[in-house]
Amino acid sequence: NSEATTRIEVVSNVQPKLLKYKIVNTYPHDYQAYTQGLEFHRDTLYEGTGNGSGPTGKRGISSLRKTDYKTGKVYKKVELADEYFGEGITILNNKVYQLTWQNNEGYIYDADTFKKEKTFPYFKKIEGWGITNDGTYLYQSDGTEKIWKIDPATLKEVDYINVYSYETKVKSVNELEWIDGKIYGNIYQKDAIAVINPKNGAVEAIINLVDLKSKVTQLPDTDVLNGIAYNPKTKTIFITGK
């Protein structure tokens, strides 16, 4: 007897709503930082950068840094070797998890000292894009429509969701941030943020940020929107680009 496997994919029945926003402040940011990850921890802004290049071809430096968000001053920074493209970051239990793009590995640092405590392989052959956490589990994007749910104790996949905006599959899900039970995700090359239900992958809302580009200093290497950080102290969302 031959057995056939049928793959069934469930699309979303939710029509995303358009959320409004208000700019409450603007802060300085290193324009040479090719931002891949952004997160607050104890009122300090942590940032992961990659060595990608903007429109002029000038390359950035892959790094992990923590900064004073009000002044842009960098308190501490560690750089990755040039063969590694730094990607998303998240902080769980005072540990910083940082992904690399195509090296199939990530790093765990002490959030205070930036001492690298572990190098870990991905649970399967995927690219590393964005990462966030819900206080218990990690959530990792890989440039497709998938977001993987990962056990931080084993760094193995326990589940995944496919991201859909109504009936349309949403690919290139990039930087992630967990805010009030939802995953806020940058979509690569789109000037918008998707608000994603972590249980089923449905995009429940969209934040259209196309107008932000005209409000930043227009530099030759200004690239795309990337970087979402929620500050629980101020209850505001910090947005940047690379």
Describe the function of each predicted region:
Residues N1-V14:
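Beta-strand-enriched, solvent-exposed domains that form extended recognition/catalytic surfaces
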Residues S12-Q32, Y69-Y75:
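A short helix->beta-strand "capping" segment at the edge of beta-propeller domains
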Residues V24-R65, K77-T90, G130:
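Beta-strand-rich domains and repeat architectures in extracellular enzymes and scaffolds
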Residues Y31-R42, D82-N93, F123-G135, E167-I179, ...:
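Beta-rich, blade/repeat-based domains predominating
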Residues Y46-G57, Q98-N103, L138-T144, G185-Q189, ...:
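Conserved beta-strand positions in repeat-built beta-propeller and related beta-rich domains
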Residues T67-G72, D110-F114, D151-L155, N197-G201:
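Short loop/turn segments that connect beta-strands within beta-propeller blades
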Residues T71-Y109, K115-K125:
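Blade-loop segments of beta-propeller domains
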Residues G106-Y164:
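Hydrophobic, well-structured mid-protein blocks that either form specific transmembrane helices
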